[in-house]
Amino acid sequence: MNDQQPFSVTASPTTEKTSAFSLTIRPDNIGVISIDVPGERVNTLKSEFAEQILSVFELARQHATLRGLIFISAKPDSFIAGADITMLNKCSSAEQAENLAKQGQETFDQIAALPFPVVAAIHGACLGGGLELALACDYRVCSLDEKTVLGLPEVQLGLLPGSGGTQRLPRLIGLDSALDLILTGRHLRAGQALRQGLVDEAVPHDILLDTAVEILKKGKRKAVPLGWRSRLLNSPGIRHLLFKMVKRKTRAKTHGNYPATEKIIQVVRRGIEKGREEGYRHEARAFGKLVMTPESAALRHLFFATNALKKTSGAASEAKPIHRVGILGGGLMGGGIASVTATRGQLPVRIKDINEQGINHALKYNWQLLTKRVQSKRMKPTERQRLMTLISGSTDYRGFEHADIVIEAVFEDLALKRQMITEIEDHAAPHTIFASNTSSLPIHQIAEGARRPQLVVGLHYFSPVDKMPLVEVIPHAHTSAETVATTVALARKQGKTAIVVGDSAGFYVNRILAPYINEAAYCLLEGEPIESIDYALVRFGFPVGPLALLDEVGIDVATKIVPVLSEELGDRFTSPPAFDAILKDGRKGRKNGKGFYRYNKTRRFWHSGKEVDSSVYPLLDVTPKAHIDPALISQRAVMMMLNEAARCLDEGVIQCARDGDIGAVFGIGFPPFLGGPFHYMDRLGMETVVKTLLVLQQQYGDRFAPCERLLTMREGQRTFYPPADKDNSIS
């Protein structure tokens, strides 16, 4: 064999097309392993790949003068996005899942044990098992491309890194930094990864391979003495304090609802204190146990559900291209919509407001958001400037003739929204879609009188727009399928998860939220303290309690939705009459510093910035005293939400249980570890759900009467998802 000529061999003993790994030996005797999973858009690791990787190593060893190996992806924007999660659904026991982890550990140990240097040349997503593979290499170099991210997100699936990640990462970047990355599952961009020591170099994509070659020439990585910081953290006393602090902080955030976080801390500690081999054993065992937990099953269900949703347009039509976007209103919502359109969608945005102040507000808001990214080194100042040039404004309709879609974000006033349609039909192109960002007004009423009703659609964003991931797309009876598909496509370009919902009062998210908040209000009127109610629901798994949420949304905004809901859907949506006193007292929530809580403008490190406003109690004529079991508080509020979600499915407000689960989790923070209302009801069982509602109905009234859908499902012993392989059946 001529060592000076490049040649290619494949990892598979069959054909190149069946192998995800192929080996090319360069003239300089450096081997390049290309990763390219056949027929897949991104690279993911599968159990059968262990044999393929080992075959590559065997072929490499046959080349006597080989200087080293470089792993690189043949996919455009994906190094390795993680393991193929469907493998876990095939595991019927913890032992089977544990064996998968052991296989990964053994395979990556083979990489670390190779007698020559190995480099991971990373471009695109390097996540989960992909990063664990890279950690087993001697060196890591990544591209500076914005699509390059590194992380161990397994905790977001209720798992821990099972192929050595819990053992290798702390030894590479330090115990505290590793715990932070593994426990949060957050992603690092190239610059962050370089600063943390996760990669050795971060370079432009076009010199990635050349840089990997130069690094490889250094030879096998030699052991480097620990720095003073690592030595300090590894001292028994400091280490004990660190683990104690991390455990306390983690439990305060998770309230014990996520078993993976406890296991992560235990496994990392075991490896640090008892050695790597012992750490591996505990890592694999913990991984196997976590795979079988209901929490992981629920989180994997959401993973599959969101992936399935991305593959649908929401309508039986193709989306038309969107080149320019118009926005009516430069307030908080309008400014937020402009931000995600320009920053994530990379689309030119034209804002119209009745005065310059509104436009200036939107521009200032976007500048502040981008400046935060510049200050955190996630964006260069030149990129901030470029994105700001995409946003312009005017007090008239100049430029709107070029808009393909106009998003209205004005006050919740029916006459005003109808006027906006008329003006857009006068000034915009005949093909321009009119999307109303309304939280309560029926779209068919807004579209009444429109000359082109087929182009009118609802597009409900949640506040704050730059942070909340969900949007509801609401067609009315005359909205065209193309309009729906195009609106969904725009929402996805903006980085949103979009569900298509029916045009009825409250749509889906606000409709299931209202009875949940109402029940919290009834608990308050029974004398339960505000903080007790909120804490009960936070412990259950919601990010904030219902009364704190009311303050955040705005008490005035929330109460405007109530008449719309109660008029169309009945008395169960009527808020307690005593609550009128809260509005009359001028309480709007955080926006005016006065709601169920008092908000201090100046925060101190010993103070959260808000405290219960006890002057609420006399307004409601109650004396606060904690007397309701927290489990009963959460049961009452959550059961109201579950019952309403089932009604929404029965009435066609949502198209399927999958959309209902996604809407609740991403729209209002329904506990992800429960998988959404429908997944949770399946887990409880229809018998338990109906029985609980009947008991609550007997105690608290007919608002708890189980809906017809639940009664029918109990009768037929049915579930919302197919019992077999439920986590992968989300249609």
UniProtKB/Swiss-Prot annotation:
It is found in: Cytoplasm. GO terms for biological process: fatty acid beta-oxidation. Residues 320-729 are annotated as: 3-hydroxyacyl-CoA dehydrogenase. It comes from the Bacteria. GO terms for molecular function: 3-hydroxybutyryl-CoA epimerase activity; enoyl-CoA hydratase activity; long-chain-3-hydroxyacyl-CoA dehydrogenase activity; NAD+ binding. Pathway: Lipid metabolism; fatty acid beta-oxidation. InterPro entries: 3-OHacyl-CoA_DH_CS (IPR006180), 3-OHacyl-CoA_DH_NAD-bd (IPR006176), 3HC_DH_C (IPR006108), 6-PGluconate_DH-like_C_sf (IPR008927), ClpP/crotonase-like_dom_sf (IPR029045), Enoyl-CoA_hyd/isom_CS (IPR018376), Enoyl-CoA_hydra/iso (IPR001753), FA_oxidation_alpha_subunit (IPR050136). Its EC number is 4.2.1.17, 5.1.2.3, 1.1.1.35. GO terms for cellular component: cytoplasm. Disulfide bonds: none annotated. The record marks 132, 154 as: Important for catalytic activity. It holds the Pfam family 3HCDH. Keywords: Cytoplasm, Fatty acid metabolism, Isomerase, Lipid degradation, Lipid metabolism, Lyase, Multifunctional enzyme, NAD, Oxidoreductase. It catalyses: a (3S)-3-hydroxyacyl-CoA = a (2E)-enoyl-CoA + H2O; a 4-saturated-(3S)-3-hydroxyacyl-CoA = a (3E)-enoyl-CoA + H2O; a (3S)-3-hydroxyacyl-CoA + NAD(+) = a 3-oxoacyl-CoA + NADH + H(+); (3S)-3-hydroxybutanoyl-CoA = (3R)-3-hydroxybutanoyl-CoA. Residues 15-204 are annotated as: Enoyl-CoA hydratase. PANTHER family: TRIFUNCTIONAL ENZYME SUBUNIT ALPHA, TRIFUNCTIONAL ENZYME SUBUNIT ALPHA, MITOCHONDRIAL. Heterotetramer of two alpha chains (FadJ) and two beta chains (FadI). HAMAP family: FadJ. In the N-terminal section; belongs to the enoyl-CoA hydratase/isomerase family. In the central section; belongs to the 3-hydroxyacyl-CoA dehydrogenase family. NCBIfam families: FadJ, PRK11154.1. Catalyzes the formation of a hydroxyacyl-CoA by addition of water on enoyl-CoA. Also exhibits 3-hydroxyacyl-CoA epimerase and 3-hydroxyacyl-CoA dehydrogenase activities. This is Fatty acid oxidation complex subunit alpha. It comes from Pectobacterium atrosepticum (strain SCRI 1043 / ATCC BAA-672) (Erwinia carotovora subsp. atroseptica). The lineage of its organism: Bacteria, Pseudomonadati, Pseudomonadota, Gammaproteobacteria, Enterobacterales. The gene is fadJ.
